[in-house]
Curated annotation (Swiss-Prot):
This is Urease subunit alpha. It holds the Pfam family Amidohydro_1. The gene is ureC. The lineage of its organism: Bacteria, Pseudomonadati, Pseudomonadota, Betaproteobacteria, Burkholderiales. Substrate binds at residue 220. GO terms for cellular component: cytoplasm. Heterotrimer of UreA (gamma), UreB (beta) and UreC (alpha) subunits. Three heterotrimers associate to form the active enzyme. Its EC number is 3.5.1.5. GO terms for biological process: urea catabolic process. Keywords: Cytoplasm, Hydrolase, Metal-binding, Nickel. Coiled coil: none annotated. The active site is at 321 (proton donor). It catalyses: urea + 2 H2O + H(+) = hydrogencarbonate + 2 NH4(+).
Length: 568
């Protein structure tokens, strides 16, 4: 017997299906379900009187033949699509995306549920891959709590704590600091990787940091990013299959942007602060977006351009870079980096896919818990100001959503050689997943899974009779305790360090994973974010021209995902 349900009734019971649209938080962004992997009339759902019961939606298969966990009827938002599906997790990895149930009695089942299977109800929820923040100043370990609760599950960068060097630069300098930070990584339920200091003109000081466990090297102007240092650093990276991140020379002391590009010699590099105010060659660092070997990112303090952006930047900059406002030269240095015209252009370059990644610059002018919020605020602002992208339709913003989610998931993973483990929702990858109610999308996740186990969730009073009574706030779950912590999170290192046996030598508990294929990534590999415009910046007016078009927009006076959701 067939029972017809209205779309509303179906969505309320099983979540949206093909052709249904979902608003992302309180933005003007709408996503539309492109495909539903489930079977109408055969959907599985857990609960009293529902489907996942013995002999019904649950089969008799043993643990070896069923997943450890199934997320049912979830909407997946990833760079490759926007679909409705059941997600299977086994041994900490995504095992399948498809139709869950009991294949003995149900048609089309690709994921068998058994007595060994836990269920997470995904009906009405959006699932995204855990975010990857590639611009972390490891100033305080409490950043990790904030990042994880925001939906970020991998943090890459450098530092040693609130040292003056770390306050300004993302470097973990030298083998001793590298060993200590890798040991500290064992205590946190998040994937971590550390960059060594790349500012040296001879190879050995850099090679020893890679051998100690660095996933790559960071060149920063505060340590002297000269053409000689750039050339040497990239040569070491080529020899060790690691990535180089660079914060270029704001003062143009050792040369202009053309000198830096020449020092790259066509070699792959991740350019931090390819943006309007964060640093690097003033005023035209944005030019590097047009280079095939440059993988550009920007940071969240300028995301998106608002009426308050300029006002807050000067004081932030003076503190972060150890400048003295009473010294005229220090003040001039700061003011040269803060330009409304290039900040406005940064919005548009993100929207057109010229800027491939977005990160935080945590506690060093950026906010570690706001990478995801500010990504989607930028997408909203551009939708409102520029309308639909050519790739989208009047019904949805699917392409724009895929472009923006890729900026903090798959593209950072590809850039830093970790896409074989994280960065997308695909079978075989580590099950770092973030579940969102659509009304709170991008702002407050419902639950964060690390390696297939719940790490953080919104949880009510532990003494209550049910999980939901107030106060409801983020609390660490069992994946953050005891031996489970080391088995649900990863530490990324160089292949050289892994081969040298640092895990045993340092006494590391977490599984170490070598980065790979860092040196053959190009701008063309940046998914949905591969545009390479020819950019010029007027040295007097700071106007930004890309492929002959002036890039400018007005600052936002109000944003979504803001005061509706936060008291403070």
């Amino acid at each position: 017997m067939t029972l017809r349900l209205s779309r509303r009734a179906y969505a309320e019971m099983f979540g949206p299906t093909t052709g249904d649209r979902v608003r992302l938080a309180d933005t003007e962004l709408l996503i539309e379900i492109e495909r539903d992997f489930t079977t109408y009339g055969e959907e599985v759902k857990f609960g009293g009187g529902k489907v996942i019961r013995d002999g019904m939606g649950q089969s008799q298969r043993v643990a070896a033949d069923v997943p450890d966990t199934v997320i049912t009827n979830a909407v997946i938002l990833d760079h490759w699509g926007i679909v409705k599906a059941d997600i299977a997790i086994k041994h900490g990895r995504i095992a399948a995306i498809g139709k869950a149930g009991n294949p003995d009695i149900q048609p089309g089942v690709t994921i068998a549920i058994g007595a060994a299977t836990e269920v997470i109800a995904g009906e009405g929820l959006i699932v995204t891959a855990g975010g990857i923040d590639t611009h972390i100043h490891f100033i305080s370990p409490q950043q990790i709590d904030e990042a994880l609760a925001s939906g970020v599950t991998t943090m890459l960068g450098g530092g040693t704590g609130p040292a003056t060097g770390t306050n300004a630069t993302t470097c973990t300098p030298g083998p001793w600091h590298m060993e200590r930070m890798l040991q500290a990584a064992d205590g946190w339920p998040i994937n971590l990787g550390f960059l060594g200091k790349g500012n040296a003109s001879l190879p050995q000081p850099l090679v020893e940091q890679i051998a100690a466990g660095a996933i790559g090297l960071k060149l920063h102007e505060d340590w002297g990013t000269t053409p000689a240092a750039i050339d040497n650093c990239l040569s070491v990276a080529d020899d060790t299959d690691t990535q180089v991140a660079i914060h270029t020379d704001t003062l143009n002391e050792a040369g202009f942007v053309e000198s830096t590009v020449a020092a790259f010699k066509g070699r792959t590099i991740h350019t931090y602060h390819t943006e309007g105010a964060g640093g690097g060659h003033a005023p035209d660092i944005l030019k590097v977006c047009g280079e095939m070997n440059v993988l550009p990112s920007s940071t969240n303090p300028t995301r998106p351009y608002t009426i308050n952006t300029l006002d807050e930047h000067l004081d932030m900059l003076m503190v972060c870079h150890h400048l003295d406002p009473s010294i005229a030269e220090d003040l001039a240095f700061a003011e040269s980096r803060i330009r409304r015209e290039t900040i406005a252009a940064e919005d548009i370059l993100h929207d057109l896919g010229a800027l491939s990644m977005l990160s935080s610059d945590s506690q060093a002018m950026g906010r570690v818990g706001e990478v995801i919020i500010r990504t989607w605020q930028t997408a909203h602002k551009m939708k409102v100001q520029r309308g639909a992208l050519p790739e989208d339709t009047a019904r949805n913003d699917n392409f724009r959503a895929k472009r923006y989610v890729a900026k903090y998931t798959i593209n950072p993973a590809l850039t830093h050689g970790i896409a074989h483990e994280v960065g997308s929702i695909e079978p075989g990858k580590w099950a770092d997943l973030v579940l969102w109610e659509p009304a709170f999308f991008g702002i407050k996740p419902s639950m964060i899974l690390k390696g297939g186990m719940i790490a953080v969730a919104q949880m009510g009073d532990p003494n209550a009779s049910i999980p939901t009574p107030q106060p409801v706030h983020y609390r660490e779950m069992f994946a953050t305790r005891g031996g489970a912590l080391a088995r649900t999170s990863l530490t990324f290192v160089s292949q050289m360090a892994a081969d040298a046996g640092i895990a045993e030598r340092y006494g590391l508990a977490k599984r170490i994973v070598p980065v790979r294929n860092c040196r053959n990534v190009t701008k063309a590999d940046m998914i949905h974010n591969a545009w390479r415009p020819s950019i010029s910046v007027d040295p007097e007016t700071y106007d930004v021209i890309a492929d002959g078009q002036l890039l400018t927009c007005e600052p936002a006076t109000v944003l979504p995902m803001a005061q509706r959701y936060f008291l403070f």
